[in-house]
């Protein structure tokens, strides 16, 4: 992209002359290419990493609420020390959604200056493990990714179910993924946002003191009925357009009451 942009800016180049001949708005083309390259790094070529900034760029629905938690995450990420975030909450409370909302805010420059050029990548541990056959292969792949990340100041890595890092790849004679990660976090070579449930945090994460002290905790409580109602009000238009129907506020309130009565093993806002 950078090479293409440089060629297009050179008004005496053949490329510029050809595009002018076909009445292409070169300035608009340069703008679009610059916008696209703003969300890209060499990490886009790695299949186990997903560029969340790019993923949410064309998302049609908005993510509502959690302003206090987002502010807390931004404050932690902007700190000089202990600037890694660990989001704790039950399944369905919106841990991944809050990271997507942060990426949306970065895209629209709605964050503090220190976060304005950041790109968030999700590291898929399952994809990383799936391609391994031999002992030590997982650790080798994991370390290669981390080595590439540490050279990029504008990258934040998001690891969902981060408790799986503790013990991942660990076998007799092998080191687990958390032991690879710890030195990089200690030297502040990279920034990580992790997400896990409350049970898994106490079961795995809290016991690993060296790993635990590298992170600042952000707890995501289950949304109340009132908060869930506001979320549903904000997103109902997308369902109305898709199904060609109208959903009244009365129906939304009834829906929340019904799921509260009949669905006990899930949490708001996911179950609504």
Residue spans for each PLM region:
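Structural beta->alpha junctions
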Residues: 130-131, 223
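C-terminal helical "lid" subdomain and adjoining coupling/linker elements of P-loop NTPases
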Residues: 241-250, 254, 258-272
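Histone-fold recognition with a strong bias for associated Lys/Arg-rich disordered tails
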Residues: 1-129, 139-152, 158-164, 170, ...
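Short, glycine/polar-rich helix-capping loops at beta-to-alpha or helix-loop-helix junctions
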Residues: 200-208
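Conserved AAA+ ATPase "SRH/arginine-finger" region at the nucleotide-binding site
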Residues: 204, 216-229, 242-250
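An amphipathic alpha-helix signature
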Residues: 225-236, 252, 256
